[in-house]
Regions:
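Short strand-connecting beta-turns/loops that link adjacent beta-strands
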Residues: 25-26, 66, 92-93
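Short glycine/proline-enriched turns and hinge-like loops at secondary-structure junctions
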Residues: 44-46, 90-91
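Ligand-binding loop in jelly-roll beta-barrel domains
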Residues: 81-106
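Short, surface-exposed secondary-structure edge patches
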Residues: 31, 51, 67-68
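Glycine- and acidic-residue-biased ligand/ion/polar-headgroup-sensing regions
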Residues: 48-59, 64
Length: 106
């Protein structure tokens, strides 16, 4: 399977957009699209390890309401299961992030 990320690109003036890339038995991948100023609110990933790879734009990720990380293109970010995070587009242009989630345990 392969998908062209450019062809999947989609933004909304109302809120962030999440598009599924694939879903397996223990893992899945999504693309997150945010216009400047938009954010994905804090949400937990109790049973998933999360890897993020920004492809376009700049933003911040707040982890567990304590750590703020700058998101920059072509950098890999990993958060263990149980983390809660928020993503915000702080740049002047669109932010696009590939997110993979891997289920841990049963």
């Amino acid at each position: 399977m392969h998908k062209n990320m450019r062809e999947m690109e989609q933004y909304s003036d109302d809120q962030f957009v999440v598009k599924g890339v694939y879903k397996g038995t223990r893992s899945e991948a999504v693309l997150l699209f945010l216009k400047p100023g938009q954010e994905m609110p804090p949400h937990p990933h109790e049973r998933f390890e999360v890897t993020l790879v920004p492809h376009k734009g700049r933003g911040t990720m707040t982890v567990n309401d304590t750590k703020e990380v700058e998101l920059v293109p072509e950098t890999l970010y990993y958060e263990p299961a149980g983390s809660t995070f928020r993503i915000r587009n702080t740049g002047d242009g669109p932010l696009q992030v590939l997110i993979t989630l891997v289920r841990v345990g049963e």
